[in-house]
Amino acid sequence: MIDPVFHRPQLAQQLADRILSDAPLAPARSGLFLAAPRRTGKSTFLREDLMPALIERGAAVLYVDLWADKALEPGQAIVSLVRSALAQEDSGLLKVFRKAGLEKVAVGGLDFDVAKVGLGTGITLAAALAELSDRLKAPIVLMIDEAQHAATTDGGNNALFALKAARDELNSSAHHGLRIVATGSSRPKLALLRASKDQAFFKAAMQTFPPLGRDYVEWFIANTGLSNSLDASRTETLFARTGSRPEVLVQALGELDDLVGSPQAKGAVDDQFEDAVNGAIAESDEAMLKAVRALTPLQGAVLRVMATQGEDYAPYAQKSLEAYAKQLAKIDPEAGVRIEIPNVQSALQALQAKSLAWRAAHGEYALEEQSLAELMKSRGLLD
């Protein structure tokens, strides 16, 4: 059976080395934050490559995607992760349990049958994970995908501080280590979790997740089923134009179904594929721009300032209020809207409701999709 997943084993090994380094001053001991745009293969890599590489080295791995169920409060999702991972017979943690020859695991003085392992009432996350790590004599790696959503609720923030306490305890000389790997689809939003001393993972290591490249393009071409192979260089250029998003290439390929297995003139398939990719990009761009065009003048002004200021955006700062007025005058000089904090608050709430803006629990705002700023700039909507 042909593997439907493109694998990145070398990258997985490199990150596994960094995550599991036992050097006392290894940056990953404080946490590793990986940022990459949404739909660029990050989550697939975590599940299909990095997780197996870590398990192969003896680590117990827990994984949760905070984007998977938007209705589930992020803090509860993290707690549920620990409980469900311990309870599932096929979880990486229980595999390590059995490999260690454990039939029962004692957590905080309480015995649980392996098939029914859970967190007992009154046992802190730090105490439970420390006891488990000690019994396994192995490090625990906790992967939190789309981790920025933890910052949107008080429960999520509390869970992060609980994990910080667990990290500090397990990374002491008395235990075997806890590594937190947090990923996010927006670098500015992910940065909020480690940019301030008031945050749980202040100054944790952060890096840009390497995008898919030529090797993915060649794998894609080899698996299209087309009689005439696509030109690798042209396809690579198209892939870069998509923002390195595999689903756009797959969508475009789906529009060439009538060509699969049929002989075509040299270059004809490439031309049609390029048209299909460009069409898919235009369709996606138009959907975002349509939402922008539907905004009120003040909402549009606030969105433009947010996109322009990026990580420095402070919604109620004097410089932002002045920037709103400037943008509003450009959008609609006759709008007749006063730039006052209550009006700005209403505009921000509307942008959040339209999924154009994202709000952290402590009041920070950022674009929901970072690519929107680049699109708006390309269309002359930003200074």
Cite the ranges covered by each PLM segment.
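Amphipathic alpha-helical "lid/sensor" segments that cap RecA-like P-loop NTPase cores
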Residues: 222, 226-286, 297
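Walker A/P-loop-proximal flanking segment of P-loop NTPase domains
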Residues: 1-37, 44-53
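Sensor-1/coupling segment of RecA-like P-loop NTPase cores
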Residues: 149-196, 209
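Conserved catalytic network of the ASCE P-loop NTPase/AAA+ motor domain
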Residues: 24-26, 54-56, 132-136, 168-176, ...
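Helix-loop-helix "sensor" segment of P-loop NTPases
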Residues: 192-237
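C-terminal leucine-rich, beta-strand-based interaction scaffolds used for sensing/assembly
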Residues: 282, 286-383
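P-loop NTPase nucleotide-binding core
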Residues: 30-141, 147-156, 325-334
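Alpha-helical DNA-recognition elements
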Residues: 52, 255, 350-353
